[in-house]
């Protein structure tokens, strides 16, 4: 359903931008993210898990069924985040999902987005920054032994990242809850911390969460990130909290790709 002239345009754009065919087509507006993802899956462009595979929670639907409506929504979010990060190196983006009192829905979104990134962009690292209430380890059924907390405290001999059952996706769990580790998160840009991990060709997605009554300095924490998507919960997230976070991100020139109301 693409004309030969369009295919030529896509190939030229992909070559110039260093992008795969599907992403180049999305950038040019010739394919929407939903169609591109389904085509890629049908072509065997990325492996899927069989229904009932116990290695990943079924809530991470993108790992099982790219045609699912939720998976399509997640691909659209990915496309918006990549568009917001258009001035960055598309091969190794630093993205974040930021939950403002949004509950489990935000963690589920982050897990699905990481899967879609691994499927469409290649090697991806998902990092659980919610040290006080980790959740991504349960969704990917990875033991939360050593993780970000140990990495920040300098007690990890090796980078504490675990391979998930999803091809190309690694998970750095939150690690064991520690007040000192939690305070370290707020003291410096995570982008600078991640730069020291040596994963120059790996895209990264960080999951962060703020709960009612907290005033986390997300602007300084996420300085240097390519794009952020905010997740709020209808009827739960206070408008004042959301406004404060948005203003803080704006002060640090952090690109906000959009917001999701769970």
Predicted segments, located by residue:
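Walker A/P-loop phosphate-binding motif and the immediately C-terminal alpha-helix
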Residues: 62-140, 225
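Signal for well-folded cores of large energy- and translation-related assemblies
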Residues: 26, 41, 78-86, 118, ...
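Helical mechanochemical/support elements of P-loop NTPase systems and associated helical scaffolds
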Residues: 6, 17, 21, 32, ...
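C-terminal lobe/tail of nucleotide-utilizing enzymes
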Residues: 48-77, 184, 242-262
């Amino acid at each position: 359903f693409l004309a030969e002239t369009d295919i030529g345009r896509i190939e030229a754009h992909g070559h110039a931008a260093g992008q795969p065919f599907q992403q180049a087509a999305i950038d040019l507006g010739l394919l929407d993210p939903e169609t591109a993802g389904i085509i890629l899956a049908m072509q065997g462009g990325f492996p899927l898990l069989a229904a009932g595979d116990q290695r990943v929670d079924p809530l991470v639907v993108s790992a099982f069924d790219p045609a699912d409506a939720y998976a399509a929504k997640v691909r659209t979010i990915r496309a918006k985040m990549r568009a917001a990060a258009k001035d960055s190196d598309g091969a190794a983006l630093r993205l974040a999902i930021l939950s403002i009192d949004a509950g489990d829905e935000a963690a589920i979104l982050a897990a699905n987005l990481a899967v879609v990134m691994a499927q469409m962009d290649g090697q991806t690292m998902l990092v659980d920054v919610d040290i006080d209430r980790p959740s991504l380890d349960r969704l990917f059924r990875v033991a939360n032994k050593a993780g970000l907390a140990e990495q920040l405290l300098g007690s990890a001999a090796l980078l504490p990242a675990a391979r998930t059952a999803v091809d190309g996706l690694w998970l750095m769990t939150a690690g064991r809850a520690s007040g000192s580790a939690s305070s370290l998160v707020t003291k410096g840009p995570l982008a600078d911390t991640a730069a020291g991990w040596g994963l120059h060709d790996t895209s990264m997605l960080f999951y962060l969460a703020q709960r009612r009554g907290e005033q986390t300095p997300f602007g300084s924490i996420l300085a240097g990130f390519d794009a952020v998507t905010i997740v709020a919960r209808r009827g739960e997230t206070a408008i004042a909290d959301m406004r404060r976070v948005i203003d803080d991100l704006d002060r640090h020139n952090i690109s906000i790709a959009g917001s999701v109301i769970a």
